[in-house]
Amino acid sequence: MESGFKVTLKDAIRTIPDYPKPGVQFRDVTTLMGNAQAFRRAVDELVYPYAGNRIDKVAGIEARGFILGGAIAHQLSAGFVPIRKKGKLPRDTARIAYSLEYGVDEMEMHRDAIEKGERVVLVDDLIATGGTAEAAAKLLLQMGAEIVAACFIIDLPDLGGRKKLEALGLPVRTLVAFEGD
């Protein structure tokens, strides 16, 4: 990468203690995204393994996955597919329900966003328990996508999300791990 790079990706991520509740260390990736050098490096590192390969679409999970996914799609000359919370898309959608800590939520995508057999990279800023990413991956698979990889800037490995995606047979790429979260 750039020889003058001074800040590590991990250093570019702000930690906010006790947010949103006591005992939680919130990893705020928006500080990395606001640092041009760090953001470029993160995007470049996530793109690198797939550059030169056929990637048809990048699917980003609402909301920070849109920011990251758009940049990655641009670099890969691929289309971008938003995966959104229920009720946010205007046309015919495919939907999947998934469990949260205290209930159930749903996410959706346009039915015509993916053609069967298209090669897709799934993107979000962070993987923790993996529930949202797992649901997004299952939705893409239901739509006929071939998921090339799931990519995240941050991994909270103690919460097991990576293992959920790997259990689906998906390669997972992360750039920074915060152990003990």
Curated annotation (Swiss-Prot):
Enzyme category, top tier: transferase
Catalyzed reactions per annotation: AMP + diphosphate = 5-phospho-alpha-D-ribose 1-diphosphate + adenine
Top-level taxon of origin: Bacteria
Keywords: Cytoplasm, Glycosyltransferase, Purine salvage, Transferase
UniProt record, GO biological process: adenine salvage; AMP salvage; purine ribonucleoside salvage
GO cellular component: cytoplasm
Location in or out of the cell: Cytoplasm
Function noted in UniProt: Catalyzes a salvage reaction resulting in the formation of AMP, that is energically less costly than de novo synthesis.
Family annotation (HAMAP family): Aden_phosphoribosyltr (MF_00004)
Similarity comment: family membership: Belongs to the purine/pyrimidine phosphoribosyltransferase family.
Name of this protein: Adenine phosphoribosyltransferase
Lineage: Bacteria, Pseudomonadati, Pseudomonadota, Alphaproteobacteria, Hyphomicrobiales
Gene: apt
